[in-house]
A protein has these predicted regions:
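Nucleotide-activated chemistry modules centered on ATP-dependent adenylation/adenylyltransferase
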Residues: 1-253
Length: 253
């Protein structure tokens, strides 16, 4: 059975995260993996996914500049869920980057720094997959406002799955507390969005939740999530196993 992506997009908008994930695992098998930076949304999604597929593949971009709290959380996730997080590293070491681009590239050209340390490793990883899963929400940034739960990733040329696209921050935190999901303690210290040590600061009262990322630059994204503003792109080669779309059922969250 073959189904255009645009049809799946429309139907999946009414699906709960569990339904979206069941569809993803049934459709792509080992050719789908979850990307996470271990933000609170990512933690909720790891918990949901692990209940459905204990062997879910999870990877993260390790820029060599993450906070100690983030590294500690990765260890806690591996122990709690019994999964091994794949860490994606840049082919360029921090020392090599400094030699080629000068010291503190993130202060002068954060886009270039993100490209070297995050985007290129992700691009290499996604080249071997048919689909990837993210925890982005539409209300996070303008670039994510048009995200669909299932869409074609124009930038990386594969299916992109966003089960939490229509969730709000309160919904995420409600799930975290209800299921006692571990999270980065920096969230309790006014860090709603956490990236690298050099480009993340605490958010001041009244600021946007991502104001602490790349402060001083007109930048809210690292470059991983291109805005699919017209995501109605047919995926003619997507094979959906017969009955999968119709048989998915949601667990209570």
């Amino acid at each position: 059975m073959r189904e255009p992506l645009e049809d799946i997009q429309l139907r999946s908008e009414s699906w709960k995260p569990e339904e979206v994930l069941r569809w993803a695992f049934a459709t792509f098998g080992d050719d789908v993996a979850m990307a996470t930076g271990f933000g609170v949304e990512g933690m909720a999604l790891i918990d949901i996914a692990s209940r459905i597929n204990p062997n879910v593949q999870v990877f993260t971009g390790d820029t060599d500049f993450l906070f100690p709290e983030t590294y500690d959380l990765i260890d806690r996730v591996e122990k709690r869920y019994g999964i091994k997080i794949e860490r994606l590293y840049s082919a360029v070491t921090p020392e090599e980057q400094e030699m080629e681009h000068g010291p503190e590239l993130w202060k002068r050209n954060p886009d270039r720094c993100c490209g070297i340390r995050k985007v290129e490793p992700l691009k290499n990883k996604l080249a071997g997959l048919r689909a990837w899963i993210t925890a982005i929400r539409r209300d996070q940034t303008s670039a994510r406002a048009y995200a669909r739960k299932i869409e074609w990733d124009i930038k990386f040329q594969l299916v992109k799955i966003n089960p939490l696209a229509d969730w709000s921050a309160p919904m995420v935190w409600s799930y975290i507390h209800k299921h006692n999901v571990p999270y980065n303690p920096m969230h309790d210290r006014d860090y709603p969005s956490i990236g690298c040590t050099h480009c993340t600061r605490a958010v001041k009262p009244g600021e946007d939740s991502r104001a602490g990322r790349w402060a001083g630059f007109q930048k809210t994204e690292c470059g991983l999530h291109a805005g699919n503003k017209s995501a109605r792109i047919p995926l003619v080669h997507l094979e959906v196993p017969l009955g999968v779309s119709q048989s998915v059922t949601a667990d209570e969250t």
